[in-house]
Amino acid sequence: MGSKIFLLLGLSIAFAILISSEVAARELAETAAKTEGYNNGGGYHNGGGGYNNGGGYHNGGGGYNNGGGYHNGGGGYNNGGGYHNGGGGYNNGGGHHNGGGGYNNGGGYHGGGGSCYHYCHGRCCSAAEAKALEATTAQVKPQN
């Protein structure tokens, strides 16, 4: 009698798993159909390849605008690249966590590196040069 109970319990669990996996597969197929294409990406959660708003895993992955890579990041051209909130790219990106390499506003690992942080007359300069330039322009300004 005990073995019949275990057999029925096992069949019930298997049936429940079958139904839940079928529902999950259907929802996943609907989500993928909605997000693939040029706008809003494609792939996992708010991601996947594409042109605008990403690609990849969660809010990320490869693409042209706002995307690429893993979580909120990854490679791309604008606002993207790398791993978490960053990574390589051309504008506003690059690297690993909150930073990394790139051309504009990026570079390095955590918190930046490899970018221009101070501008003097339209070119990159050191912090000392920027401070000296600021001091000289502050002396020239008229006082009200």
Swiss-Prot record:
The chain crosses the membrane at residues 5-25. Pfam families: GRP. Its main location: membrane. GO terms for cellular component: membrane. The keyword Repeat applies. It is found in: Membrane. Residues 37-113 are annotated as: 11 X 6 AA tandem repeats of G-Y-[NH]-N-G -G. Induction: By light. It comes from the Eukaryota. Belongs to the GRP family. This is Glycine-rich protein HC1. It comes from Oxybasis rubra. The lineage of its organism: Eukaryota, Viridiplantae, Streptophyta, Embryophyta, Tracheophyta.
